[in-house]
């Protein structure tokens, strides 16, 4: 890439952005203005953002007109360090013509690994088993104790079949699954690469032994998984969500787990985040993680560099590597 034609200022919204990303920006002429608050303070951001050329948004607080107004008319671009952008007011960016980037794609392998971990942990009752140990309540003399669901010979269903779902499906090719099915608005042309079958939403619910949610949160998908959906699933099924908590009606999920409508759930995302320690979801058959699907050193650095390169491309008048619109 060519160097930017002049020095430019970049607001970094979080002090823990990967060092290689900061070094890349600085090597190309950026003055980095780093917010120091953890969690990020909106007041600090609003104080430091006026006059910057770019914003590197590395957290999930709302990114909207208030931030853009505070930045000023000289703002040239913004990139989030995230795959999902449900916290961004995209129409506001489009109205103003401000380039917006994000970091999908590079997260797929880390999230896929974690999703399979959740399938196993929830399907085999890891959390409940650990709880029994802590209570000295092992029941190994009971044949049906901790009876779980295994991946072998199971129907694996995906809601959404983009990069993350396909990375999971690729990993499952050697797990002797019965079949892989998925639901999206239209069939994916490359689904044959994963021996996957496009099905209706109802068929996905009815046939899946493991149902993995890996789709964006939109008005169409919000609370797509509710009581009506859970009632169509097998009683032995395992529900896994690595997308966004908002795709699930958590009250209905709690009821489905309490009533035995489904067997278990593995969640890396919830609403809200952090999930309160007194949440009823923590008292039913679950394996819940604190939204850590991308939390590996390799993936975090890759996300950081991609966000930085999105900004550099826009500053240099080139298309962003991963534009959000």
Label every model-predicted segment.
Residues 2-101, 226:
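An N-terminal-biased, well-structured beta-alpha scaffold segment characteristic
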Residues 100, 173, 227, 236-238, ...:
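Rossmann-like dinucleotide-binding domain for NAD(H)/NADP(H)
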Residues 59-60, 83, 209, 215-217, ...:
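Short glycine-/small-residue-rich Rossmann-like dinucleotide-binding loops
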């Amino acid at each position: 890439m060519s160097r930017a034609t002049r020095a430019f200022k970049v607001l970094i919204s979080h002090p823990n952005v990967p060092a290689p990303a900061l070094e890349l920006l600085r090597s190309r002429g950026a003055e980095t203005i780093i917010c120091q608050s953890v969690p990020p303070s909106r007041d600090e951001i609003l104080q430091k953002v006026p006059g910057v050329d770019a914003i590197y948004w590395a957290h999930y607080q709302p990114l909207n007109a208030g931030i853009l107004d505070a930045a000023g008319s000289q703002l040239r671009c913004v990139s989030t360090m995230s795959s999902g952008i449900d916290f961004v007011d995209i129409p506001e960016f489009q109205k103003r013509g401000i380039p917006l980037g994000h970091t999908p794609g590079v997260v797929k392998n880390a999230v896929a690994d974690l999703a399979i971990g959740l399938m196993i942990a929830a399907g085999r009752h890891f959390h409940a088993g650990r709880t029994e140990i802590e209570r000295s309540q092992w029941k190994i003399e009971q044949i049906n104790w901790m009876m779980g669901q295994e991946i072998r010979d199971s129907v694996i269903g995906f809601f959404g079949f983009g990069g993350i779902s396909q990375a999971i499906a690729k990993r499952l090719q050697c797990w002797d699954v019965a079949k892989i099915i998925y639901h999206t608005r239209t069939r994916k042309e490359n689904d044959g690469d994963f021996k996957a079958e496009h099905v209706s939403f109802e068929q996905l619910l009815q046939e899946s032994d493991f149902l993995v949610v890996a789709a964006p949160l939109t008005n169409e998908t919000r609370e797509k998984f509710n009581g009506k959906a859970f009632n169509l699933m097998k009683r032995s099924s395992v529900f896994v969500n690595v997308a966004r908590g908002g795709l699930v009606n958590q009250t209905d999920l709690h009821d489905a787990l309490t009533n035995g409508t489904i067997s278990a759930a593995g969640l890396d995302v919830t609403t809200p985040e952090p999930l309160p320690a007194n949440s009823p979801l923590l008292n039913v058959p679950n394996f819940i993680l604190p939204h850590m699907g991308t939390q590996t050193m390799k993936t975090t650095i890759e996300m950081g560099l991609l966000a930085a390169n999105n900004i550099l491309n826009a500053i240099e008048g080139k298309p962003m590597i991963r534009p959000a619109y």
